[in-house]
């Protein structure tokens, strides 16, 4: 009796039901396929709205980051973070070697520093704390990001000019290599125009050559004497 109850309570395998439906011609399989199609369609429709919602979420996250950064900047909390990270002995001046080794830091800190420097750039430079002046200067002209590898330490850092604006392409080895590479090669638009002009000239020259060699295209020009005949004396 117990064995019979245990067998009755066991669930029927799904594969067995599908085989039975195909064998008996039942519409259960068709209804299952239709329900799967409806679910997939609803999922596709939902994905159309997920893109806009993710964009709204990113915009809200950017606004939240900006508001949080400005709040920490005005309260002085972010200034203390900068001093603890980039200053050693003198709390009013950042150490250059600390900026060279630690800037811009993790992704979250980099985003906050970028928002803070953009916010401070609209304010009076003279009223800006000394540490923020240094961070803003290094953020704009430092050897990080696209200027990685350029020397920043010295009287006249590479890739930045204080008084002399001559010979910009000779300021550093990377700029000189870029200048020489760009001076030897044409840009894509100039190459396209040059190739098109060469193709048109070649087609015109070949057409002229074929016309000269084709006997059917040659004509004989008759020279007519159009001089008026002299009248005989009467």
From Swiss-Prot:
Location of this chain's protein in the cell: Mitochondrion membrane
Transit peptide: 1-66
GO terms under cellular component: mitochondrial membrane
Membrane topology designation: Single-pass membrane protein
TM helices/strands, residue ranges: 192-209
Principal location listed in the UniProt entry: mitochondrion
Keyword field: Membrane, Mitochondrion, Transit peptide, Transmembrane, Transmembrane helix
Taxonomy, superkingdom: Eukaryota
Function comment: Involved in respiratory growth and required for cell survival in the absence of prohibitins.
Family label: Belongs to the GEP7 family.
Entry protein name: Genetic interactor of prohibitin 7, mitochondrial
Organism whose genome encodes this protein: Eremothecium gossypii (strain ATCC 10895 / CBS 109.51 / FGSC 9923 / NRRL Y-1056) (Yeast)
Gene name, Swiss-Prot/TrEMBL: GEP7
